[in-house]
Amino acid sequence: MYTFLALAPILVVLVLLVILRLPAKISMGVAYLVTALLALFVWQASGAQVAAATVNGIIVALTLLFIVFGAILLLNTLKEGGAIVAIRKGFMDISPDRRIQVIIVAWLFCSMVEGSSGFGTPSAIGAPLLLALGFPAMASVMAVLIIQSTPVSFGAVGTPVLLGVWTGINDKPDITQAIAPLSTENYLLQIAGNIGLIHALVGFLIPLLLSGFLTRFFGKNRSFVEGLKVWPFAIFAGLCFTVPYYLVAKYLGPEFPSLVGGFVGLMIVLPLAKRGFLMPKETFDFAPRAKWDEDWLGSLPEERFDDSIAPRFSLVRAFSPYLIVIGLLILTRVIAPLKAFLTGNLTTIEFTNLFGTTISSKIQLAYSPGTILIIASLICILLFKMNGQAVKRSWSSSATTMVAAAPALLLSVPMVQVFINSGSAAEVVNSLPAMPILLAESAAGAFQNAWPLVSPWIGAMGAFIAGSNTVSNMMFAYFQWSTASQIGLDANLAAQVVALQAVGGAAGNMIAVHNVVAACAVVGLMDKEGYVIRKTLVAMTYYAIQAGLIGMGIIFGQIWWWILAVIWPIAFFGIMAMTSKKAVA
């Protein structure tokens, strides 16, 4: 019974948001009430615990809104300054094919952004950029969410592994004994290599899947097959990222795989794409905007382009704000003294032990990607010689969009925090663990030796709930290791199970509710979150199943698991192809 009750908040979100497609501000409001009532009256969490989790959620939501504001401000500033015209022309010169553009921008560029910053920054930068290139708002959001899978485990310079997995496995006597004489630090590097391998084996097909989803849901013909026609370029772009990504993860550690993979991929793919290497014979474009479904459109004003008019700026100058953002993100994350200052006491507002609980929260605006996006926007004023009216329009419209996004985030994140912190109060007899832990324990009891097949789904559940691969790994890394040990796996194979947790947690970012809400907000796509999740849930399902099959093959060494790992992508792409020419979901 408790397992079903623990599942209730997730079911409420799925039914209201995904199936009934109600706005997130309504769905998450109901989910928050259900979660809070269960925590108080069934789990018997203290009122102070629920209140502290709620306040922490509000603080996190406000920091996300700050990033949303910065992302929209940069887009609006580029529009008002005239730089978008040059950026659009630059990408059109590389290829006018939307399938090629989405692979370059979402898969390669946003993966590099994920490697430098993470925590939703790829959506904040990539979705507005695709929108500016003429993509429907919903297509822009779908694309940047689907790629938040392979690069996520090593996002923010390896934070999901260095902080998330490390917190789960460090100072655990049973792990220390099992891995001796290996140190925990070296064991973490082993896990990082495992993560890189599984992601690489699954992720190299993501550009092809992305192209198929683009044509299936947003093409004139609603044809998944139309997206598959770029398979040589898509697989090439997939390998250009995943090969250096895996090599860095295996031999250098978890800090730079996504950053290096994205950068190397761009350096190889961009010049070759401009020369027409592996380009499809037919160019894919969207139907005229007048024929787009209303659900695809955001609230941001439509941009009209006359490609016969020469841009006012060179592509390098127009794109330089994005280069500034990437540069500042890398500097503030990699240079230790600078990072220490930006996250130190002088620049941090901290709320410790809220309402007498162990829950604490902090605000680090100086370290926030939102601040970097605002700095880049201010530089644009000088760079593009903007007048006062243009600056005023960009700031006011950005503030309006942020305010419209606020209700959904201010309800989504507190619901998540209450769910995570729902464990029974210390004085309660027959206390219950927090809801996500109880769900994971129930799954472990049910699946036993098939656990590697299920392991990615636990990671995905953690990310879906928490909106973070890092938090998912913190919650479940030790649980995954313990479960692996209980079914008789040695330390080396248990490291593979922990890797599957991290891989699933990365894939779960595609459907994490407040990630989706924030991504929709930066393109003005309000109240359409459920429509987006219906699409990204399909991609996440593909990723988690494939990771589980590969995990079973690695851990148990049976050839038929590897055969299934080959059959599953073929079957998935075949099923998607058979759904062509049907109404958009």
Regions found by a protein language model. Give the residues of each.
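Long, contiguous bundles of hydrophobic transmembrane helices that form the permeation core
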Residues: M1-A6, F204-N353, D527-Y531, I545, ...
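Alpha-helical transmembrane segments of multi-pass membrane proteins
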Residues: R99-S111, A137-T150, L163, Q177-P207, ...
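Hydrophobic transmembrane alpha-helices of multi-pass solute/ion transporters
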Residues: M1-L73, T77, V85-G90, D307-P311, ...
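Juxtamembrane helix-boundary/capping and inter-helix hinge elements in multi-pass membrane proteins
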Residues: L22, K79-A83, P96-D97, L130-S140, ...
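Transmembrane alpha-helical segments and their short flanking loops
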Residues: V161-N194, F241-V243, D490-L493, V516-A585
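Re-entrant/interfacial helical elements at transmembrane boundaries that shape
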Residues: T121-L131, L145, G158-N170, F213-L214, ...
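Membrane-embedded alpha-helical segments and adjacent helix-loop junctions characteristic
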Residues: A51-G134, V141-M142, M386-T483, I487
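Hydrophobic core segments of alpha-helical transmembrane domains in multi-pass membrane transport
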Residues: A8-I19, A31-F41, V68-L73, C110, ...
